[in-house]
From Swiss-Prot:
Description of how the protein assembles with itself and partners: Homodimer.
GO cellular component, one term: cytoplasm
Organism of this sequence: Listeria monocytogenes serovar 1/2a (strain ATCC BAA-679 / EGD-e)
Descriptive protein name: Redox-sensing transcriptional repressor Rex
Originating gene: rex
Cellular localisation: Cytoplasm
Amino acid sequence: MMEETTKIPQATAKRLPLYHRYLKYLDESGKERVSSAELSEAVKVDSATIRRDFSYFGALGKKGYGYNVSYILDFFSKTLSQDKQTNVALIGVGNLGTALLHYNFMKNNNIKIVAAFDVDPAKVGSVQQDIPIYHLNDMEEIVRENGVEVVILTVPADEAQVTVDRLIEADVKGILNFTPARISVPKQVRVHHIDLTTELQTLIYFLENYPAKTE
């Protein structure tokens, strides 16, 4: 399914988790079908965009009927690899890393942090939220043992690149980078940068220059 996903526009790919989360809620609520208009209201994406997004995957719904919730939930679960558990490692257990350890990823999907790494003697060897914290020196071995291909990076910026180089040697394929460093990786490795300061600055800019329309 991942090969199919790579053929769709990136903007569509980014919206798939939104659809999946709401469809999971509908399924758990016992709802059997949903229209694009209902989805639009819930996820705040216009219905024409939703229909176009869904069209990339073939005929998922019927005109006048809408979409079968159970069917498209199962379809998107496979597309997003949510039909199996994805093991993730957290690199860096500072303030942000600790907060992420306490976030229940398994509540709405099959993403699980299976190991965390740090150099602080007070943290190494401890267990937080049932997640063991190992010394950074053991990172490559533990990552391989747990079949981890995706990591969350929250180390200090000046340690980011050397840490990433080691992760690549351990066959990591995806990095969610919370550091301000712009890291270099081979083309087969995917990096998503999450810079909270930049996101806030962007939000403030849009608030000041493109105020939301009032009714």
